[in-house]
Amino acid sequence: TFDKKEFSALPTTESEFTITREAGTMTMKGKFEGNEGYGKFTFTENADFKTFLAKEGIEITKEHDMMMLFMGNINRDYVAFLKQNGYKDISKSKLVELGIHGLTKDVLTNYFSTFDKKGLTLSKLIELKIHGVNAQYKKSLNDAGFIDVPLQQIIEAKIHGINAEYLAD
């Protein structure tokens, strides 16, 4: 998703406008009516950001992957945040998945404070987000008396629709 403030302008007539992020620039040609727009777009990757990623050991070979990083608003600060939190070997596919699934720095920080960080691989973080496991869900299990439940069992409980109300029955 995009914040309205990211757009260079929202035209009411057929027009061209851009959104620029570290991964690149999306140029859109179209029209907005109210809060909805339609049209066509082109994406131009940012070669400097691509070079930065390569220096970080993340080799991007397809423009599509750069566009996915753009859509997830993945930037230098985000990559540095991952590395500062112990994720040294970040693959292109994991970085793309983190962006696609909306694992922002705030979401990750929440996971780090809620769950035992040593078990939180990038794959596990993505799995938590996909299945909607969060601090509130873990707290509801704790409040129902289920305190030292292993992370994988918490995920499985969420997948199978087990919640505090179910546990109270």
What is the meaning of each model-derived region?
Residues 1-169:
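General marker for long, soluble alpha-helical cores
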